[in-house]
Regions:
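Short, Lys/Arg-enriched N-terminal segment that forms or immediately precedes the first helix
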Residues: 1-15
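Short, cationic-aromatic polyanion-contact patches
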Residues: 11-22, 36, 66-89
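Short acidic, hydrophobic short linear motifs in intrinsically disordered regions
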Residues: 33-43
């Protein structure tokens, strides 16, 4: 499957072994920039507890940083997805090597990431 903006969440889930909610939130943070749990809750129609739980999960996976107790920001997408892919390889005792789909995810999200931060 080729990676494009229509299937990016699905590819994030399959290649990085993250949940559907984690993929949705990661893409949201890349597109919006710094967000807090209240904003996440409103934009994704989740409870604040769910928003906080999923954001903390992305922090633990090395894709997002917590700026404050309730504010989150994505790492640069190329770094974030490679970082997660490397961790996934370690978790599954797989040799870390180039993965074109993972590289393409980072490249596709780089434009929206930059646009959200140049406001």
């Amino acid at each position: 499957m080729a990676v494009n903006m229509k299937n990016i969440e699905e590819v994030l889930e399959s290649e990085l072994r993250i949940s559907e909610h984690e993929a949705k939130l990661f893409v949201l943070i890349v597109y919006k920039g710094k967000v807090n749990t209240e904003m996440i809750s409103k934009m994704l129609h989740w409870s604040i507890d769910e928003a906080d739980r999923v954001a903390k999960s992305l922090v633990n996976r090395g894709m997002v940083i917590d700026i404050t107790k309730s504010e989150y920001e994505s790492l640069h997408p190329r770094f974030a997805v490679i970082n997660r892919y490397r961790r996934r390889c370690e978790e599954n005792n797989i040799i870390f090597k180039k993965n074109t789909k993972v590289d393409n995810i980072g490249m596709l999200l780089e434009g929206p990431y930059n646009n959200a931060r140049i406001k």
